[in-house]
Amino acid sequence: MASIPCTFQLSARASSASAAAAARRSPRAAARLGWLRPSRLSAVVPASESGRVGPTCFFKFGNKDAEGAGIYGSQGRDDFDRDDVEQYFNYMGMLAVEGTYDKMEALLNQDIHPVDILLMLAASEGDKPKLEELLRAGAKYDVKDVDGRTALDRAADDTREFILGFAATLAA
């Protein structure tokens, strides 16, 4: 998973009289906690410049979008593994419905790549954003499970049309 550098600036308005009183009551704590020190960031971009007071976060992606920055949609087939299958199985509530990991383990014990298993699970759930991500990563919708069913067989009609349409868009 990609990490994003982020800087937070918290500013609070206080009168100089109340800050001075706090410093007199506990000068060591005031110095240690930086109560009387202005933020180094506030000299560059004060929070009040935007017209609001509160946290401000600066993300530096340059000229890249989320995909180019490696956050979403930049994974390939081999970037998915068994742990991703288990996490998706749990996240989508399939364990709660099934009651056991048997269905997931049966798929993982076959000679099927984890990204293709994820595509089957996402197709059965109708999870279009996940389907899009997996198809971009190179998942194959014609891989068969132990019952001979593909992701298309598991999908509802609208999801099936989405898979075929999106795959055609990627092929073009």
UniProtKB/Swiss-Prot annotation:
Alphabetical list of PROSITE patterns matching this protein: ANK_REP_REGION (PS50297)
Subcellular location: Plastid, Chloroplast
Claim: Iron is one of the keywords in the record: no
Placement of ANK repeats on the sequence: 114-146
Alphabetized InterPro entries for the sequence: Ankyrin_rpt-contain_sf, LTD-like
Key words of the record: ANK repeat, Chloroplast, Plastid, Protein transport, Transit peptide, Transport
Transit peptide: 1-28
Protein's GO biological process: granum assembly; intracellular protein transport
SUPFAM superfamilies: Ankyrin repeat
Functional description taken from the UniProt entry: Involved in the import of light-harvesting complex proteins (LHCP) and subsequent routing of these proteins to the chloroplast signal recognition particle (SRP) pathway.
Listed name of the protein: Protein LHCP TRANSLOCATION DEFECT
Lineage of source species: Eukaryota, Viridiplantae, Streptophyta, Embryophyta, Tracheophyta
Gene that produces this protein: LTD
